Amino acid sequence: MYQRCFDNASETLFVAGKTPRLSRFAFSDDPKWESGHHVHDNETELIYVKKGVARFTIDSSLYVAHADDIVVIERGRLHAVASDVNDPATTCTCALYGFQFQGAEENQLLQPHSCPVIAAGQGKEVIKTLFNELSVILPQSKNSQTSSLWDAFAYTLAILYYENFKNAYRSEQGYIKKDVLIKDILFYLNNNYREKITLEQLSKKFRASVSYICHEFTKEYRISPINYVIQRRMTEAKWSLTNTELSQAEISWRVGYENVDHFAKLFLRHVGCSPSDYRRQFKNCFAEQEILSEFPQPVSLVG
């Protein structure tokens, strides 16, 4: 038997009216997943590594996350995520927005120059259970639940991550700055990957030679500008294949290819299987039994 009573004294962590809201949840179990560099302008991502090893590049720094590690990628951070080839990762991600901790900027959770990857400590089992619940409930909900329920998840996770990262290791040097021009080019490609983009267009827009752009971009991001665009398109195509019922032709058009056959050939070349095979393998219909077998039996948060 145990009972604990609480007084009415409250500690306000958030600025009034600035509590977290959930904008996106993602579950990734593709053993060859590689996102490519990208940016979220208005979201902060809270990531939980369920199993395996994931590699994160965040603002020029490389971090390796293992099972039961938690990761924070704040809005505006240039980042890339890749599953380890030898120990593929399964990850869960909640993207939050609209929150502001006391004394911090909007959507900022980390202390300045904090390491964004740590082992989950305080509330570890609760974090695991919350992500498990979202993995089970969301695929079955079909918008039947109110947004307040999802925001309750966001609120709880934000506080748990905040408490875990409060004393995380901090680097005195802070974040390494990349070449500003090359970073601007990547931001442009990230935001306009659906458009027809040529090296000549980039050269004219950014007033730099084609050879300079190709050399410096490839040196910085280990991929050429054009292959980055292709990778970005393939990443979006994967999400559409596994989370929508859109036809291949519609997906092809949405990611920037007018010719569906050309899209299918590129997908096969870069992903290693056809779009239809990828959809069959990773379609968002994972069985609840598979999830529950790897997590503790969840405590139901809904009646």
Swiss-Prot record:
InterPro entries: Cupin_2, Homeodomain-like_sf, HTH_AraC, RmlC-like_jellyroll, RmlC_Cupin_sf
Domain of life, source organism: Bacteria
Domain HTH araC/xylS-type: 183-281
GO MF term set: DNA-binding transcription factor activity; sequence-specific DNA binding
Annotation: DNA-binding region: 200-221, 248-271
SMART domains given in the database record: HTH_ARAC (SM00342)
Keywords: DNA-binding, Transcription, Transcription regulation
Coiled coil: none
PANTHER family in the record: ARAC-FAMILY TRANSCRIPTIONAL REGULATOR, ARAC-TYPE DNA-BINDING DOMAIN-CONTAINING PROTEIN
Protein name (Swiss-Prot/TrEMBL): Uncharacterized HTH-type transcriptional regulator YdiP
Organism expressing this protein natively: Escherichia coli (strain K12)
Source species taxonomy: Bacteria, Pseudomonadati, Pseudomonadota, Gammaproteobacteria, Enterobacterales
